């Protein structure tokens, strides 16, 4: 990967169109397809469409070792309300399916971002009974974090393996491993993708602890501040971000990218806040080699303007550095 500061854009309903894809030429470094939100049967179509409308490279971002909700219809809950999560064929389930067997009574679940928290109060072979510990909304495909303990999951899902197989046929050269937790995760990913560019995502307390070891095995890392905040608490994100970048500087040729909430305001508004501008500048000043736009370009109303503002901030940072 090049030494220039990179911009990674997540594609979604707002940006998977000819106009935005054409706009990204010479402005964006990578276009991210998030397999947590891309249907397997649509992947070939998306890759073909992207390649026809832009020369910007594609990055396949795996689902990785994360638990997600599977429900037919979103539902609102009050505090202390009881609900069930079924193992199979229920209105509310979890993905990947094998996680059901790993959950225990008293496990505390944090679902989505500021959406809902609940505790498992009973379990049988068919379903879990949970009691909400906050009010909130339960929606489909939301990340689920187990607050009280670490659950070992496969580093890639079946869907991930299928996506990698498809991507290889299209000669995609860039891949990201979500929830890189251990040295073994990196070794396994390197083995199945030996020649491709790989980005390893730091999204858990375990990953932060192991980051020093990670830098000996790979070159490109991404701090996902959203999922990481579920594991180490949001107030510790600035500390973790600085720690990881500081460690990266002790190793030659290491790149740290940062994601989540850089321009959250621009999902609905044409201009960012002063705090967002400051966050971007501070991240660059710390030594971030790349910045990631997620919801801003995937579902935001102004994906092109978000990219333009990020480019402005990078230019200002570079110019100020020369003063």
Name each region found by the language model.
Residues 1-323:
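Non-catalytic helical/linker scaffolds that mediate oligomerization, partner binding
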